[in-house]
Amino acid sequence: MDNTVLCVRWGDKYDDTYVKKLKEQLDRHLTVPFNFYCLTDNPKEEYDIQLPTLWDEHYRADKNMFWAYRKCYMFNTDKHFPQIKGSKFLYFDLDILIHNNIDCMFELDMYRPYIVRGWWND
């Protein structure tokens, strides 16, 4: 499968029920086949992938590096996450709500990154 959805559950802000709810929403609102992976420091499910120990190296409080910058490293699949399959990637935060079909997101030109913020309001 070329289509892949990624999320991150790291720390204790969100528990694994958020990951399950995201997966359920994707199953309901994607009609195209897709891979699903959750990068986590506490793997429990078959779709969970252990975060590498170097994950914390991408956070430097003294440099005021925003935590989200570390998310960018998940797209370096060859180096950090060789088990992630696919060529088209979507990333979702765990607190997202998906209300309608999102197949069109996999039709976007994947050669450039998109950040969708408040799509519902556009």
Question: Residue locations for each model-derived region?
Answer:
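Short aromatic/hydrophobic "clamp" motif used to bind/position activated sugar donors
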Residues: 89
